[in-house]
Protein backbone atom coordinates (compact mmCIF):
# COMPACT_ATOMS: atom_id res chain seq x y z
CA UNK A 1 0.00 0.00 0.00
CA UNK A 2 1.05 3.60 -0.63
CA UNK A 3 2.43 5.77 2.18
CA UNK A 4 0.30 8.82 3.01
CA UNK A 5 1.21 11.88 5.05
CA UNK A 6 -1.12 14.19 6.92
CA UNK A 7 0.54 17.52 7.66
CA UNK A 8 0.19 20.91 9.28
CA UNK A 9 2.05 23.71 7.49
CA UNK A 10 2.69 27.05 9.14
CA UNK A 11 1.86 30.17 7.13
CA UNK A 12 3.43 33.62 7.35
CA UNK A 13 0.47 34.93 9.38
CA UNK A 14 1.07 32.09 11.91
CA UNK A 15 -2.03 30.20 10.77
CA UNK A 16 -1.85 26.45 10.16
CA UNK A 17 -2.90 24.69 6.97
CA UNK A 18 -3.79 20.98 7.05
CA UNK A 19 -3.57 18.59 4.09
CA UNK A 20 -2.66 15.10 2.88
CA UNK A 21 -0.13 13.91 0.32
CA UNK A 22 1.95 10.94 -0.78
CA UNK A 23 5.16 13.01 -0.87
CA UNK A 24 5.52 15.50 1.97
CA UNK A 25 8.52 17.49 0.68
CA UNK A 26 7.18 17.68 -2.90
CA UNK A 27 3.91 19.02 -1.49
CA UNK A 28 5.78 21.62 0.56
CA UNK A 29 7.57 22.78 -2.60
CA UNK A 30 4.23 22.98 -4.44
CA UNK A 31 2.74 25.11 -1.66
CA UNK A 32 5.73 27.47 -1.69
CA UNK A 33 6.31 27.76 -5.47
CA UNK A 34 4.89 31.17 -6.38
CA UNK A 35 5.69 30.93 -10.10
CA UNK A 36 3.79 27.68 -10.67
CA UNK A 37 1.52 27.33 -7.65
CA UNK A 38 -0.09 23.92 -7.23
CA UNK A 39 -0.98 24.51 -3.61
CA UNK A 40 -4.42 25.15 -2.18
CA UNK A 41 -6.17 28.50 -2.60
CA UNK A 42 -5.59 29.14 1.10
CA UNK A 43 -1.82 28.85 0.69
CA UNK A 44 -1.86 31.12 -2.37
CA UNK A 45 -3.12 33.91 -0.13
CA UNK A 46 -0.99 33.03 2.90
CA UNK A 47 2.65 32.17 2.31
CA UNK A 48 3.67 28.75 3.66
CA UNK A 49 6.91 29.02 5.63
CA UNK A 50 7.41 25.57 7.19
CA UNK A 51 6.10 22.09 7.85
CA UNK A 52 4.94 22.35 11.46
CA UNK A 53 4.01 18.68 12.04
CA UNK A 54 3.35 15.53 10.03
CA UNK A 55 2.20 11.96 10.46
CA UNK A 56 2.59 9.01 8.11
CA UNK A 57 0.47 5.92 7.52
CA UNK A 58 0.32 2.93 5.21
CA UNK A 59 -3.39 2.43 6.03
CA UNK A 60 -4.48 4.19 2.83
CA UNK A 61 -6.02 7.43 1.64
CA UNK A 62 -9.30 6.87 3.47
CA UNK A 63 -7.61 6.79 6.89
CA UNK A 64 -5.45 9.80 5.97
CA UNK A 65 -8.56 11.72 4.89
CA UNK A 66 -10.28 10.92 8.19
CA UNK A 67 -7.36 12.32 10.15
CA UNK A 68 -7.17 15.40 7.92
CA UNK A 69 -10.88 16.09 8.50
CA UNK A 70 -10.46 15.72 12.27
CA UNK A 71 -7.41 18.00 12.39
CA UNK A 72 -9.22 20.69 10.40
CA UNK A 73 -11.91 20.77 13.10
CA UNK A 74 -9.46 21.26 15.98
CA UNK A 75 -9.01 24.66 17.58
CA UNK A 76 -5.84 26.61 16.83
CA UNK A 77 -4.71 25.95 20.40
CA UNK A 78 -4.97 22.17 19.96
CA UNK A 79 -3.20 22.33 16.59
CA UNK A 80 -0.37 24.25 18.25
CA UNK A 81 -0.07 21.51 20.88
CA UNK A 82 0.26 18.97 18.07
CA UNK A 83 2.93 21.08 16.38
CA UNK A 84 4.97 21.05 19.56
CA UNK A 85 4.14 17.45 20.55
CA UNK A 86 3.09 15.50 17.41
CA UNK A 87 3.29 12.24 19.36
CA UNK A 88 0.18 13.38 21.30
CA UNK A 89 -2.02 12.90 18.21
CA UNK A 90 -4.25 10.28 19.82
CA UNK A 91 -5.31 12.68 22.56
CA UNK A 92 -7.21 14.53 19.81
CA UNK A 93 -7.99 11.73 17.34
CA UNK A 94 -9.92 8.61 18.27
CA UNK A 95 -9.55 6.82 14.93
CA UNK A 96 -7.41 3.78 14.26
CA UNK A 97 -3.91 4.04 15.66
CA UNK A 98 -2.17 3.70 12.31
CA UNK A 99 -0.29 7.01 12.25
CA UNK A 100 3.32 7.65 13.24
CA UNK A 101 4.60 11.18 13.87
CA UNK A 102 7.64 11.94 11.76
CA UNK A 103 10.68 14.09 12.38
CA UNK A 104 10.61 17.09 10.05
CA UNK A 105 13.85 17.77 8.21
CA UNK A 106 14.80 21.44 7.83
CA UNK A 107 13.99 22.87 4.40
Q: Each predicted region: which residue ranges?
A:
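Structure-specific nucleic-acid interaction/processing domains
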Residues: 1-18, 22-107
Amino acid sequence: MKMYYVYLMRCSDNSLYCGITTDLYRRFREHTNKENPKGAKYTHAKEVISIAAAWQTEAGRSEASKLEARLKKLTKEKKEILCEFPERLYEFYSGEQVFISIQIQPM
